[in-house]
Regions:
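Flavin-dependent oxidoreductase catalytic cores
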Residues: 1-211
Length: 211
C-alpha cells in the first residue's frame, strides 16, 4: 500500500507537477489508521499513538525518498469528524503527529480545522491549530472557512504561513484576482460537488474587469 502512494507521487512529478500533498485527513485511508475510533488493530499499526501514526510516517518517508521532501506536503484534519471517524484525544494524537513530521523537513503541513467563535469557550478549547502551530517547526498552512479578511488577519497574527482556499476556488477560477481587486465572489453550488459531469467544474465565469 505504501508503494502505491510512492508510485502516484512519482507519476505526478513526471507529469510536471511541482509537488504532491498526502491526504491524511477527512477520514480517508491514512486518517483511518491515525484515529482510535476506527483503528482497532492489535499489531504494530494499532493501539498506541505512535503505532497508529506508523502508516502515515511510512508513507511520508517513502514518498520523500522518492521525490524529495521539499516536494511533499501533508494534510491533517484533527477535529474534523466525518463518517463517525474521530479520535478520543485529538490533541495528544495530532501534536505527536506534527512532532514526528518535524523530522522530514516537508514543504508544509496543511491543517483543516474551522476556526471557532472565540466568544464561545466551549468551541475555542477544542481548536488545536494554535497548539499545532507552536509544535510544528516548518511551514504551516491552514484551511477552514476563511475569507480574504479573516485569512489576512490570521497571517498578520502569525497563525500560519499561508491560508488555503478550497470552495471559493471552485466557483471563482480567478480567486486570486478577485482578492487582489477586492471583487465580490461567486457562491459555489454545493449540489454539483462530487459529481461526474462538467457542471460545477468548468462553467463558473471569471469576473468582468470592466465593471
Amino acid at each position: 500500500m505504501v508503494q502505491e502512494f510512492v508510485d502516484a507521487s512519482v507519476r505526478a512529478i513526471e507529469a510536471g507537477l511541482d509537488g504532491v500533498e498526502l491526504h491524511a485527513a477527512n477520514g480517508f485511508l491514512i486518517d483511518q489508521f491515525t484515529r482510535d475510533s476506527i483503528n482497532q488493530r492489535d499489531d504494530k499499526y494499532g493501539g498506541t499513538v505512535d503505532n497508529r501514526l506508523r502508516f502515515m510516517l511510512e508513507v511520508v518517508d517513502a514518498v520523500c525518498a522518492a521525490i524529495g521532501a521539499g516536494k511533499v506536503g501533508i494534510r491533517l484534519s484533527p477535529t474534523n469528524n466525518v463518517w463517525g471517524i474521530k479520535d478520543s484525544d485529538p490533541g495528544n494524537t495530532f501534536v505527536r503527529a506534527v512532532e514526528r513530521l518535524n523530522t522530514f523537513n516537508l514543504a508544509y503541513v496543511h491543517i483543516l480545522e474551522t476556526k471557532p467563535d472565540f466568544e464561545s469557550p466551549e468551541e475555542s478549547k477544542d481548536y488545536l491549530t494554535p497548539l499545532l502551530r507552536e509544535k510544528y517547526q516548518g511551514n504551516l498552512l491552514i484551511n477552514g472557512g476563511f475569507d480574504q479578511l479573516t485569512g489576512n488577519d490570521a497571517l498578520e497574527n502569525n497563525e500560519a504561513d499561508a491560508i488555503a482556499f478550497g470552495r471559493p476556488f471552485i466557483s471563482n477560477p480567478d480567486l486570486v484576482e478577485r482578492f487582489q481587486y477586492e471583487k465580490p465572489l461567486t457562491e459555489a453550488n454545493s449540489t454539483t460537488f462530487y459529481t461526474h459531469h462538467a457542471e460545477g467544474y468548468t462553467d463558473y465565469p471569471t469576473m468582468d474587469m470592466s465593471r
